[in-house]
Design a protein with these regions (language model features):
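Carbohydrate-binding surfaces of carbohydrate-active enzymes
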Residues: 1-185
Length: 185
């Protein structure tokens, strides 16, 4: 998560010179060797806020792979990468990924995803189609309880919530290439 610098050796110029880099071991970490805050830090921060706040919802869910995921290769940038995590009652999250290490991806355009659930069918989006920018990813909630108000789905990523004495506030983030939509049954 944070790059660094090996200290200079006392008896030889480099410590462990056969096993590790001479001095720098930054590796494009979210926080650079000299404290630089990179874009990946901000992207991970949003994801970590989500996982921290909604741990119980995520851990109660099981992963369901798409048919495409079972045969997809890393070089296949044409096929949408997605999986679902759903709990036994039918609440869940749609994970979309348009990034692949060491492969040049393209914008995913004009697609939709339909999920069958015990609570009912959910089509992302209800009408029309979605777009997901090159190298973007998203975790979209469906059949999600917002303090007793059931959200059928959102095409914005749930980030965290804040609770005050008078209300609970939910925070979402727009996904690159995607229009934000919130649908209640």
């Amino acid at each position: 998560y944070h790059g660094g610098t090996h200290p200079k050796g006392k008896t030889v110029p480099y410590m462990n010179e056969c096993d590790v880099p001479k001095f720098s071991y930054d590796y494009q970490a979210p926080l650079g060797e000299f404290g630089q805050v990179r874009l990946s830090y901000h992207q991970l921060k949003l994801q970590h806020l989500f996982y921290q706040e909604f741990t119980s919802e995520i851990t109660a869910a099981k992963t369901v792979l798409s048919k495409e995921a079972e045969v997809q290769t890393p070089e296949d940038v044409e096929t949408l990468r997605y999986v679902v995590r759903a709990d036994e009652q039918g609440h869940g999250f749609l994970y979309l990924n348009n990034y692949q290490d060491h492969v040049e991806t393209i914008d995913q355009t004009d697609f939709c995803v339909t999920i069958q659930s015990d609570l009912g069918e959910v089509r992302f989006p209800q009408n029309g189609s979605l777009n997901l920018a090159k190298d973007a990813c998203a975790i979209l909630p469906y059949w999600f309880s917002l303090e007793g108000h059931l959200l059928k789905y959102a095409t914005a990523q749930l980030i965290t919530k804040a609770v005050s004495s008078h209300a609970t506030y939910y925070f979402f983030s727009k996904i690159r290439g995607m229009s934000g939509e919130f649908v209640f049954p």
